[in-house]
Amino acid sequence: MIKYTLEFPIKSSVSVLFNAVSTPDGLSEWFANNVNWKGNTYTFIWDDSEEEAELLKKVNNQLIRFRWKSQDDDTFFEFKIEVDPVTNDVILLVTDFAEDKEEQENETKLWETQVHALMKRIGS
């Protein structure tokens, strides 16, 4: 598996961005058509599919990490928020895993599309 991280500058407050990447309502605005949550299980629903993810770690206004229940235990996807100490720019780091370089390229394009939708949604 290839672990990769994508970096996106986001023009938003940390709290607004964290809400968008960590809550069912926020995630359903840009990541999936609908998101349900029960305990540590998030169910992501798209037009013709549904997938469950386990919440692995959450640090308010900093990080949220999920593991797809259908995937290998060592993989996860994560949204991490950093603030540049010099410029105060807000950065969203998306970490994910791919089987090979081709899958990584395809997933990178998908993440870019998804994060663009996120930015549009929060007015970035």
Where are these regions (language model features)?
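Well-ordered beta-strand positions
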Residues: 9, 45, 56-57, 82-84
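Beta-strand/loop substructures that line and gate deep hydrophobic ligand-binding cavities in soluble
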Residues: 67-120, 124
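Hydrophobic ligand-binding cavity/cleft-lining segments
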Residues: 1-34
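Charge-dense, helix-prone N-terminal extensions
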Residues: 1, 15, 28, 42, ...
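Glycine-rich portal/gate segments that line the openings of hydrophobic small-molecule binding cavities
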Residues: 25-76
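Conserved short-loop catalytic and cofactor-binding motifs
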Residues: 5, 43, 99
